[in-house]
Curated annotation (Swiss-Prot):
Entries under InterPro entries matching the protein: ATP-grasp (IPR011761), ATP_grasp_subdomain_1 (IPR013815), D-Ala_lig_Van_CS (IPR000291), D_ala_D_ala (IPR005905), Dala_Dala_lig_C (IPR011095), Dala_Dala_lig_N (IPR011127), PreATP-grasp_dom_sf (IPR016185)
Source organism: Hydrogenovibrio crunogenus (strain DSM 25203 / XCL-2)
EC annotation from Swiss-Prot or TrEMBL: 6.3.2.4
This protein's encoding gene: ddl
Annotated protein name in UniProt: D-alanine--D-alanine ligase
Function as written in the Swiss-Prot or TrEMBL entry: Cell wall formation.
Catalysed transformations (reactions): 2 D-alanine + ATP = D-alanyl-D-alanine + ADP + phosphate + H(+)
Length: 313
C-alpha cells in the first residue's frame, strides 16, 4: 500500500461516523435530497462510515449529535443554509462542513450580502428593496429596464423573474413575495454569466453558463438538457485570474469557509459584477462545483472526501 493510500485510510478512520444532512424544510428540499444522495454514495465509495439523515427538526439534530462524529451539510435554502442548522450544530459541538452560522446567515441574505460587498468596494449591480415597510413606488423607481426581481432569502433561482417593462414589475414583485417578504429588484446586466467555485481557500477554474432561457433559472439549473457549461470558460488566463481574485475577496468578505460558489456577470465592457454567493452549493449531476473540481482532476468522491476532511482538527 502506498503512502498516499495509507494517509487516506488513516483520514477515513479519523472521520468516524458521518451524518449526511439532507432534505430539510425549504423550497429546495427536493434538490437537497438529490445532493445528499450523491454525497452519501461518494462517501461510502471512499470507505467512510456515512448515513443519510433527512432532517426537519432541532430534535433530530440533537439525536444525530449523540450518534455521529461529524456532519456533511447538504441542506439547501432556509434553515439548512441560512445559519439555523449551523447554530444548532455549534451548540452541540458537532463539526460540520461549510460556513459557520454568521457567514451562512449573511450569504443566504442577498440584500445584506450586496450591502456588504458595496461597502467594501466590490462591484455588484444597482438595486432597490421592496418590503412591507418599503412598498414598491413606481413614481420614484429609478432603475433602467430590464431588471431582475428576486426574493432576498431563496436559492436555486426560486421566485425570480426578469422584467422588461414597468407595467410588469408589480406582478413580478407579487410573485416573489410568495417566497419572501423582502424583495430585491436588481439592475439586469447584459453580458456573459459565470460561476466560480471556492475550495479550501482557492478559486477553482471558472465556468461560463449558456442557456436559452432569459437567465440561469431553476429549470436551466436542474432539468434542462440545453444548458451549456464551458470549462475552460473562454476567458484569457490573465482575465480569469483577475476575476478569481475578486471572487476570493467576495468570499472572504462574507466570512465563508471550506467551500462555496460565487455567481457573477461579465458585461460588454468586461466589467465583472458580483451577483450572489452560495455556501452550500448543489451536488447533483447538473451541479457546478463538481464540474469545476473535475477540471483540476478532482473526482466527485475525492471532492466530497476533501470537504468532510476539512472538519478534522
Amino acid at each position: 500500500m502506498t503512502q498516499s493510500s495509507n494517509q487516506t485510510k488513516d483520514r477515513v478512520q479519523r472521520l468516524g461516523k458521518v451524518a449526511v444532512l439532507m432534505g430539510g424544510v425549504a423550497a429546495e428540499r427536493d434538490v437537497s435530497l438529490r445532493s445528499g444522495a450523491e454525497v452519501l454514495k461518494a462517501l461510502k465509495s471512499e470507505g467512510v462510515d456515512a448515513v443519510g439523515c433527512d432532517v426537519t427538526s432541532v430534535a433530530q439534530l440533537v439525536e444525530i449529535a449523540q450518534k455521529y462524529d461529524r456532519a456533511f451539510i447538504a441542506l439547501h435554502g432556509r434553515w439548512g443554509e441560512d445559519g439555523g442548522v449551523q447554530a444548532v450544530l455549534d451548540s452541540l459541538a458537532l463539526p460540520y462542513t461549510g460556513s459557520g452560522m454568521t457567514a451562512s446567515a449573511l450569504a443566504m441574505d442577498k440584500l445584506r450580502t450586496k450591502w456588504l460587498w458595496k461597502g467594501v468596494g466590490l462591484p455588484t449591480p444597482a438595486f432597490i428593496v421592496v418590503s412591507p415597510s418599503r412598498p414598491l413606488d413606481v413614481e420614484t423607481f429609478d432603475l433602467t429596464f430590464p431588471v431582475i426581481v428576486k426574493p432576498s432569502h431563496e436559492g436555486s433561482s426560486i421566485g425570480m423573474r426578469k422584467v422588461d417593462t414597468l407595467d410588469a414589475l408589480q406582478e413580478a414583485v407579487d410573485f416573489a413575495q410568495q417566497y419572501d417578504s423582502e424583495i430585491l429588484i436588481e439592475q439586469w446586466i447584459t453580458g456573459r454569466e459565470f460561476t466560480c467555485a471556492v475550495l479550501d481557500g482557492e478559486a477553482l477554474p471558472m465556468i461560463q453558463l449558456k442557456t436559452d432561457h432569459d437567465f440561469y433559472d431553476f429549470d436551466a439549473k436542474y432539468q434542462s438538457n440545453t444548458t451549456e457549461y464551458l470549462c475552460p470558460c473562454g476567458l484569457e488566463i490573465a482575465e480569469e485570474k483577475r476575476i478569481q481574485a475578486l471572487v476570493l475577496q467576495a468570499f472572504d468578505a462574507v466570512g465563508a469557509r471550506h467551500w462555496g460558489r460565487v455567481d457573477l456577470m461579465l458585461d460588454d465592457q468586461n466589467q465583472p459584477w458580483l451577483i450572489e454567493i452560495n455556501t452550500v452549493p448543489g451536488m447533483t449531476d447538473h451541479s457546478l462545483v463538481p464540474m469545476a473540481a473535475k477540471a483540476v482532476d478532482l473526482s466527485f468522491s475525492k471532492l466530497v472526501l476533501k470537504l468532510i476532511s476539512l472538519t478534522l482538527p
